[in-house]
């Protein structure tokens, strides 16, 4: 990678990934792609190029790729799980239609594409322990359906057109840099904000509901290393399972009470 376009650079992952890439590739163009009304601010805006790139607008993607001689696209545009359920049509338009636009530009311009998948792509029939790489998925949310579709569409573009597509299936991501953005696992970040503000936290999950999580720096490393890997050694491209830790709301709340005894 040398010149990279990050679509969705102001989102939860994109904010930190853009800066990490600029540190990793100081001599390249790491372009922060944003949508109107969500322009980059602070160090993201000050430390490198930016371009308005709405993933539903294929021409904007192509223009940014041409202008900055982009060789790799990180497609991070998506509605997160809880938000997607409230807006299923928009979730499909961004998650699948936007990916199609990105893959078409990549096919025409010779770019590699990273599009994250998720544990949300799994369903009730998926083995919970030591989940196999290749297994039944069958998600029952629009978010998960768009992720499975994205995995298959990316694989198709690799087989059919030779586009270099790669991905990992992220668990819930924990970050203090960007605020939560509507994901089911975002309670694990929201709960700390409530504790600091002295508020009572209303958790959307029942005690005993364990979910896989990952600290953002580990997720960024996975996203970069998969794109740097020798393609000849990749058994799977879309998508590798990655995990880090698992906990339920009680574990977090009990730990918070060690520092904030009155937290509820």
Regions from the PLM with identified roles:
Residues 4-24:
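N-terminal Rossmann NAD(P)H-binding glycine-rich loop of SDR-like oxidoreductase domains
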Residues 45-57:
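Rossmann-fold cofactor-recognition segment
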Residues 55-94:
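NAD(P)H-binding glycine-rich loop region in Rossmannoid oxidoreductase-like domains
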Residues 67, 86-113:
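NAD(P)-cofactor binding segment of oxidoreductase domains
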Residues 75, 100-142:
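Conserved Rossmann-fold NAD(P)-dependent oxidoreductase catalytic core, especially the SDR/UDP-sugar
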Residues 96-102, 146-154:
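Conserved catalytic Lys-bearing alpha helix of Rossmann-like short-chain dehydrogenase/reductases
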Residues 155-210, 216-220, 225:
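NAD(P)-dependent short-chain dehydrogenase/reductase
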Residues 199, 204-206, 211-264:
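C-terminal substrate-binding subdomain of Rossmann-fold SDR/epimerase-dehydratase oxidoreductases
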């Amino acid at each position: 990678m040398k010149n990279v376009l990050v679509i969705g650079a102001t989102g939860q992952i994109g904010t930190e990934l853009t800066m990490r890439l600029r540190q990793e590739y100081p001599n390249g163009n790491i372009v922060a792609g944003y949508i109107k009304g969500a322009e980059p601010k602070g160090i993201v805006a000050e430390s490198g190029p930016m371009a308005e790139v709405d993933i539903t607008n294929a021409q904007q993607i192509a223009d940014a790729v041409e202008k900055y001689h982009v060789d790799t696209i990180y497609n991070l545009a998506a509605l997160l799980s809880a938000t997607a359920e409230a807006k299923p049509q928009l979730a499909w338009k961004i998650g699948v239609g936007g990916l199609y636009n990105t893959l078409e530009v990549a096919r025409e311009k010779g770019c590699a594409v990273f599009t994250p998948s998720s544990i949300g792509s799994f369903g009730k029939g998926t083995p919970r322990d030591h989940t196999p790489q290749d297994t039944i998925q069958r998600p029952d949310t629009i978010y998960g359906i768009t992720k499975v579709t994205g995995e298959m569409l990316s694989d198709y573009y690799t087989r059919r057109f030779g586009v270099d597509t790669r991905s990992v299936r992220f668990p819930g991501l924990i970050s203090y840099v960007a605020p939560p953005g509507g994901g089911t696992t975002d309670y694990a970040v929201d709960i700390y904000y409530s504790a600091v503000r002295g508020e009572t936290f209303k958790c959307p999950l029942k005690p005993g509901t364990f979910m896989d999580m990952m600290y953002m720096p580990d997720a960024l490393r996975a996203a970069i290393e998969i794109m740097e890997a020798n393609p000849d050694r990749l058994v799977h491209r879309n998508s590798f399972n990655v995990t880090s830790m698992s906990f339920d709301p009680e574990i977090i709340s009990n730990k918070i009470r060690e520092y904030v005894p009155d937290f509820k």
